[in-house]
Amino acid sequence: MTIVTAIQIYTYSREREEKQMSKKFELTTESIMYFGRTLFRIKALVGFGNVETGELGGYIEKEENLDQSGNAWVSGNACVFGNACVFGNAWVSGNAWVSGDACVFGDACVFDDACVSGNARVSGDACVFGDACVFGDARVSGNARVSGDARVSGDARVSGNACVYGNACVYGDARVSKSTHLFQVGCIGSRHGFTTFYRTKNKRIHVACGCFSGDIDEFEKKVIKNHAGTKHEKTYRAAIELAKAQIEDVEGGE
């Protein structure tokens, strides 16, 4: 072995050791199949945040799914795959999953059986939990909470101290930054379903009710056409008036 070769081997070994030491986690050989992808359980190499050295975490597809810096972590049976990423101080835990090109960061948390997918972003101190789903190009930030069986999608923005819960569906160009930007009622109508009223970026009230999705005025016309003279007309029209009284920061609002 020449001196040059010895130096090269030593340099390579040092670089490899330094690179390994800079990592906070590694992929283990324990794996699962999830949505047709092979995911690997992670293991902490150092202690950070509330994670101890040697602690086993959840499952990711590749190292890029979880940042090696910060206190971000994936725990329990949670899964992160595709081009999704978790970074900052964010946590994904329980049976939650993050996929597609979605990102969870800041001090955000996703847990229980919740999912974040598509090009969605969950950030700040926001939390998504229960069986809730955030997908499409939706953004959930600030101190917002999305829970229950709620769905947030499209170009929707949920922020501030807003809470989207139950069976609420918020999508399209929704702009919900406080609890008075949303109103939900159920079980009403011939199908005993849930109806969600929410504020849009144009400061109008949008309605999501079964297959219907549109402006509140369009919804009222639809109700009159389909349920004229029935108790369902009375119930829906009462809900419409309550929504107009409840939802703030909209055109024609109080």
Task: Show the residue positions of the predicted features.
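Charged phosphate-binding loop/patch that engages nucleotide di/tri-phosphates or the phosphate backbone
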Residues: H232-E254
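Extended, small-residue-rich solenoid/repeat segments and analogous flexible loops
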Residues: R14-C85, N89-W91, N95, G252-G253
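Mature, structured domains enriched in cysteine- and short glycine motifs
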Residues: S75, T200-N202, C209-G210, K244-E251
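A structural signal for alpha-helix termini and helix-coil/disorder junctions
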Residues: F48, K225, G229, D249-G253
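Glycine-rich hexapeptide-repeat left-handed beta-helix
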Residues: V116, C127, C133-V134, R139, ...
